[in-house]
UniProtKB/Swiss-Prot annotation:
Name of the top EC class for this enzyme: isomerase
Ranges where the Helicase ATP-binding domain occurs: 7-284
GO MF annotation, one: DNA polymerase binding
InterPro entries in alphabetical order: ATP-dep_Helicase_C, DinG/Rad3-like, Helic_SF1/SF2_ATP-bd_DinG/Rad3, Helicase-like_DEXD_c2, HHD_RTEL1, P-loop_NTPase, RAD3-like_helicase_DEAD, Rad3/Chl1-like
Record-listed ATP binding positions: S42, P43, T44, G45, T46, G47, K48, T49
Biased amino acid composition, Polar residues: 853-863
Subcellular location per the Swiss-Prot or TrEMBL entry: Nucleus
Cited function: A probable ATP-dependent DNA helicase implicated in DNA repair and the maintenance of genomic stability. Acts as an anti-recombinase to counteract toxic recombination and limit crossover during meiosis. Regulates meiotic recombination and crossover homeostasis by physically dissociating strand invasion events and thereby promotes noncrossover repair by meiotic synthesis dependent strand annealing (SDSA) as well as disassembly of D loop recombination intermediates.
Protein known as: Regulator of telomere elongation helicase 1 homolog
Enzyme Commission designation: 5.6.2.-
Amino acid sequence: MPESLIAGIPVHFPFEPYPVQRAYMEKVIHCLRDGTNGVLESPTGTGKTLSLLCSSLAWIRTRQSEHQMQMVKMEKADFSGIGGGAPGGDLSELAKTMGRANNWGVPKVIYASRTHSQLTQAMRELKRTAYANMRSVVLGSRDQLCIHPEVMRELGNSNKTNMCKLRVHSKTCSFQMRVESRKDHPDLRGPTIMDIEDLVKVGQRLKICPYFASRELARANKIELGNTIVILDEAHNIEKICEEYASVQIKSSDVAMTIEDITHIRQVFASGESQDMAGDEPKDFTLDDLTLLKEMLLELEKAIDAVVVDNAVDGTTFPASMMYELLGKANFTYGNVASIISLLDKLVQYLLVASQQMSIRKGGTFTLLSDLLTIVFANKEDVMSKVYASFKVHVLVEESKQGHGKQQGAKQQGGWLGKGTIAAATGSSKVAKIINFWCFNPGFGMEQLLNTQVRSVILTSGTLAPLKPLIAELAIPVAQHLENPHIVDQSQVYVKIIGTGPDRQQLISNYANRDNPKYVSSLGQTILNVARIVPDGLLVFFPSYPMLNKCVDAWQASGLWADISCKKPIFLEPRSKDQFTSTMEEFYQAIRDSKGAVFMAVCRGKVSEGLDFADRNGRAVIITGLPFPPLKDPKVILKRRYLEANRTRENQLLSGQEWYNLDATRAVNQAIGRVIRHRNDYGAILLCDSRFKDASQVQQLSKWIRGHLGDRPQCSPFGPIVRELRQFFKNAEANMKLPDERETDSPLETVCKTEVEPLAAIPKVKREPGSNATFKSANESAIKVEMANSIKTWTPADYASAAGRKLGGAAPNAMDFMSRLDSNVSSIDFNCCTDSKSGSSGLVKIHKRERSSPTAPESTSQVSKKRYKLVENIKVEPSSSQAKVAPEDRAAFLRELRSLVTQDQFRRFGKALLEYKNGTYESFQALMAILLDVLSAPKVRYMLVGMRKYLKNEHKEEFDRRVGNL
């Protein structure tokens, strides 16, 4: 495999890298080498994933070699004379040793992406590289990995998760019980790179649970964020992810149904039916627990009833403190929330069993309440000022809900107002409500990630531009940034702004014009004329579903729909998840016909966000308008207000209007990225809205698109565009090689029927120039995994605990960080480039974590899993009036230490420090024993405190505890 020297690192690449790939890999290596953060944009089709893997693994391999040489050198060093040699001689060696304490081993690389299918594609790319000898383990959710037939019969992610927890807790899952005895089986520990399907097959063959087997392997390799490189691929929506996963909603009907469920459980207990269902097995909760919880929920319901909504249509906004006041009235506090969440989880498991024997809900409302408490009380008390600035509570009137309640009326059942009564209830507080707890600061979550002392964070995607607003919102220091051009030549892409249709009617999809019949007709005629010219697949993206439906209805009535259908069959993006797969299969089948097909979809939909329309599947894309967020949407209004209130010259945040415009353009960039998927692809991009010529809109498009539009883009007349477009495809078909049949004839095997998030691009392995190897179609071997693209929710349990350190007035210590981030991630962990089966060998990890009730013992959730906490550096008051602080410089630290202790003590300290590098827990205990023996006296205890920064992350909590007990 060819080797290229990039930024001083030898990188093995499957072929000679293109200039854009070299530039990209240079930026990645600079980030890893310097321990800085990067924001890197490289258009889809430029080999971004392959470049990420090869550059990061090449740096890891080089770093590993350097580390091994250092270890050999230190092992040969003779420290028998520590304390008795030439002045300063031994100190320099010890200083070097302590200097490497901040980086005891080779940093790991966590490669994270949005969906399971994207991670599967990354694993396929890894198999193509010279770094494919890495052992691997795939970490997926239960949807992908569970093989228990009864659990898999459950509908919904939450039900599957809870049923799995129940069976593990009750020891009725034979697959999970075999994991411990077979976790070291060669099929699991071998060097072969496994994807999700491979792991499932191994689990079925060994009759063990793939889900828990993969987590055993993860625990064996101690995944921690300290000194780790985090690469977030497909990060174009990272701000929204940070905001949405820190937000939560609870409805009056949810509270009412929770009360009803508790009442039903109490009745079952009272009647003795629970004994019939569970036999003599003791319950995890008592009637007193149920009574207390019901009283608290009744108080919460009363508190929600008392909230006055001034505007029953748009709702009313309150400060974030209102949520804590509301829960406080029901006695939900920081002191008892953990025990309440634990009780809720036990009730969910109880209802799962009960629902199999009687008609009863499975505890979904308990899960909702648990999510609410987990997210709201994840914001620690000492950072409330930042919480109040970053969050808002917005209360809406809940329509047509039936359930528990006290109101009566002709159109009411169980207390909830029916449709038509909301307006009349505006002046009343006792109506069903929706309580939204919204986060508007994405930097709130990113700051927590940085405070874990990761070595680097790299955000990358095909559509990140413009970069400055993204960096400003995330509030992370960025040393490396890149906007790559596309890998294709100018002649392979045709980009034009179409301002008028064939009838010279202006094309502008703004609010004032979208209902204009002349505009709708002109847009249809434009699509008809383009469909006559474009070969194979034509994609048409609309700003919204209502606009799509409006155009379809008008064209069907006027006959335009039939005219377009005569040229190419038309497919509409279905809103139903179940219909999506069949629709896509039919579209790909139509592409195989000579006429091709038209696919009409919406920006931000499944098609625009994830699918791959390479080669014949997508020869042109039409953008019919700018998909601005709903202007009157309460969340949009509050986001704009937040930006205006917090914008300063220093933080360079966008104004509310700039953010509003950018949100639309980013959705356009993502839709455009469905075509031009590789080096030999070609296609046309037609922007059918005259507003695209505005400088403010052009500057927000991806850099490679701006290059085709020029400095001062103008709307082109329709006639010349038709002639140019016809000539473009004539030249392209003559000069570009035909796509391989494997790229167009493959079925859509990676599309899931129950998609939650937009589908990932259908992975295709291309034959690159300079390579004689022939690769099988990725689609032909695509993995069929149920819900492979769904994204599990998570709760940011430690946002504020990390971010709040600055609010306390003290900057966080450089080495004071958590060992784990409680958030949903998908990752590949690159630890080592050897195929050794020894404990020091590396591991590749792909995993996604899901939100689940945070209390079950086997759960990976926050309450049960969190083992570490952020702590401030221990402060010890010396006997003197002026507090002493250990020197920051290593050499100065050692000189002062040697001046304070005896020669024998200093020699023992030096030897213990060197042995500590072996990484065993026993060596830490030996070092602690010497430290406590030598430095526990009040006059020198400040030196003991100063040693904390040189300890490994996993030992700091015990160090704090033992020093705190002095």
